């Protein structure tokens, strides 16, 4: 029976089936967006949804909430050369969203990393790592957009909490098969880099993308 919950670990478990190149993608620090742009000729973000919803139990605990509250939830695909590379799921502590993450409302199809890694007030907690089965809620959300991925038994994922002022933001990144075949660029380091201007934000939005942001 497949698990609906993921076991998150402080370190990526050693597994001979995970090639070194894949481990570099999964464990690399700094801005993942910058690394994706370095590894592709064209990069863009497709926003799938942005609306309040209840986070998973392990998510609201990771944010330090004492009970579940509807949180601003943003889901996007990071696309390299017109092929989805990463599914990103972000939830924001609703108590401090407007004060500490004011840019989130107008982000649209721009990358979150472009705002996080240029702000010296943002701090990032250490990564946690997991493998998500097709029954996991985040896999289910992904598979509604990319149903072919339901045949993948496990997809590697990582998450970390970003902090700014009193606010917390949990970002989970699910690595898709196409990305893991690409050569991983050099690590940008813990602080990340200022992002190059090579992002296509002028594409036709889906109906989900046209929903007003909350």
Curated annotation (Swiss-Prot):
What this chain does, per the record? Removes the pyruvyl group from chorismate, with concomitant aromatization of the ring, to provide 4-hydroxybenzoate (4HB) for the ubiquinone pathway.
Q: Which domain of life is it from?
A: Bacteria
Compositionally biased spans, kind Basic and acidic residues: 197-214
Q: Which family does it belong to?
A: Belongs to the UbiC family.
Q: Name one GO cellular component term.
A: cytosol
Species of origin: Cupriavidus metallidurans (strain ATCC 43123 / DSM 2839 / NBRC 102507 / CH34)
Which residues does substrate bind?
74, 112, 173
Cellular compartment(s): Cytoplasm
Residues spanning the signal sequence: none
Q: Which keywords, in A-to-Z order, does the entry hold?
A: Cytoplasm, Lyase, Pyruvate, Ubiquinone biosynthesis
Q: Which reaction does it catalyse?
A: chorismate = 4-hydroxybenzoate + pyruvate
Q: Gene3D superfamilies this protein is in?
A: Chorismate lyase-like
In Pfam terms, one family for this protein is Chor_lyase
Q: Mind listing the GO molecular function terms for this protein?
A: chorismate lyase activity
The protein's name in its UniProt record: Probable chorismate pyruvate-lyase
Stretch list, region Disordered:
183-214
Quote the InterPro entries the UniProt record gives. Chorismate--pyruvate_lyase, Chorismate_lyase_/UTRA_dom_sf
Q: Is this entry keyworded Calcium? A: no
Give the Enzyme Commission number: 4.1.3.40
Q: In which pathway does it act?
A: Cofactor biosynthesis; ubiquinone biosynthesis
Biological process, per Gene Ontology: pyruvate biosynthetic process; ubiquinone biosynthetic process
